[in-house]
Amino acid sequence: MQETVAYKRYLAVYDRTVEFSSPTTTPANAEEKISIKYDIVGHPRSGFRFVAVLPFHSETREFTVCREYIQSVNASGVTVPTGGHEPEKHGEDIANAAKAEMNEEAKLVGGRLVNLMEKKSENEGDREVGEEEGFIETKWCRNKFVPFLCVDPKDVEEGQEGKLDVEEFALETFRVDLKELKRMMYSGEMMLPSIITCQMSLDYLVKSGLISKDEYHGSS
């Protein structure tokens, strides 16, 4: 495999060439190879890792979500607090990135943070030291994301709010009930990493008894 950087700004585009055995290999041409070029996209500044975190407020039975500008379709869309894991800013623990994004985008701190990927990987023993678990964002993207749930965070104190990135100028934060969250998840307006984070969070909340099965199914 060979790879070079074709373009780099906020994201990087990699020109990757991969060599495969020919699909028409026979004993007579066993050494025949084919080379295929791919465009690969990723965010090297964050080590190709990001987080998505869904805040749940048990007293009001609500969830905090965001509405922000989605540049690819030039329209607004719904997300949960989401952002890159930058080791120089957050340290090696990816949970710190989830806490920071929740502070910056939702103005929430504290609560019980749950890494929804822990013990999910069947290949955990195959990982190299420092390699993070996570879902691959898309087949042509190097980024992986780790979903988190935060139960009962509190409003951040005045003056302690994290600073939004300049491109997040239009971000709005609001709360929704379970019925509205599920509607947004399957309406086409929510980003896929956020949908996965919401579904895994709801599964966790039901299994842990924080949301009853009747409450979950009654919201459909």
Predicted regions and their residues:
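Conserved active-site beta-strand-loop modules that form the wall/rim of enzyme catalytic pockets
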Residues: 62-63, 111-113, 144-150
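Acidic, metal-coordinating catalytic segment for phosphate/diphosphate chemistry
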Residues: 3-54, 59
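Short loop segments at secondary-structure junctions
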Residues: 21-23, 57-60, 69, 151-155, ...
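Nudix hydrolase/Nudix homology domain
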Residues: 73-76, 81-83, 124-134, 141, ...
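Conserved Nudix-box catalytic region and its N-terminal flanking loop in Nudix hydrolases
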Residues: 41-54, 59-100, 104, 108, ...
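Short conserved catalytic/interaction loops centered on acidic-Pro-aromatic/His motifs
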Residues: 108-118, 137-141, 157-161
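Conserved hydrophobic/aromatic beta-strand scaffold that supports enzyme active sites
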Residues: 13-15, 54, 65, 147-149, ...
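Acidic pyrophosphate-coordinating catalytic loop
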Residues: 2-9, 21, 43-46, 121-144
